[in-house]
Amino acid sequence: MDNDEIFSKVRSIISEQLDKKEDEITIDSRFVEDLNADSLDIYELLYLLEEAFDDKIPENEANEFETVGDVVNFIKKRKG
């Protein structure tokens, strides 16, 4: 799975969960500042991402996610 495929899947999940248009979500979009996600939104997104990619996201790693790109890079590292 390459970065574009991961980004596309992540963007789709974010779009649905946060009720945003996919074209509003970029690799550099910040969850809180740009996408207006609150802590509950982020928690739910993490759950959906874990389900979608069949992987556990450790809390210490998740706390470092500021942008969509951070999530994409994390998943890319884990999926090799």
UniProtKB/Swiss-Prot annotation:
Keywords: Cytoplasm, Fatty acid biosynthesis, Fatty acid metabolism, Lipid biosynthesis, Lipid metabolism, Phosphopantetheine, Phosphoprotein. It holds the Pfam family PP-binding. The keyword Lipid biosynthesis applies. The keyword Signal does not apply. It is found in: Cytoplasm. It comes from the Bacteria. InterPro entries: ACP, ACP-like_sf, PP-bd_ACP. Residues 4-79 form the Carrier domain. One of its GO terms (biological process) is lipid A biosynthetic process. Pathway: Lipid metabolism; fatty acid biosynthesis. One of its GO terms (cellular component) is membrane. Gene3D superfamilies: ACP-like. PROSITE patterns: CARRIER (PS50075). SUPFAM superfamilies: ACP-like. Disulfide bonds: none annotated. The modification O-(pantetheine 4'-phosphoryl)serine is found at residue 39. 4'-phosphopantetheine is transferred from CoA to a specific serine of apo-ACP by AcpS. This modification is essential for activity because fatty acids are bound in thioester linkage to the sulfhydryl of the prosthetic group. One of its GO terms (molecular function) is acyl carrier activity. Carrier of the growing fatty acid chain in fatty acid biosynthesis. HAMAP family: Acyl_carrier. Belongs to the acyl carrier protein (ACP) family. This is Acyl carrier protein. The gene is acpP.
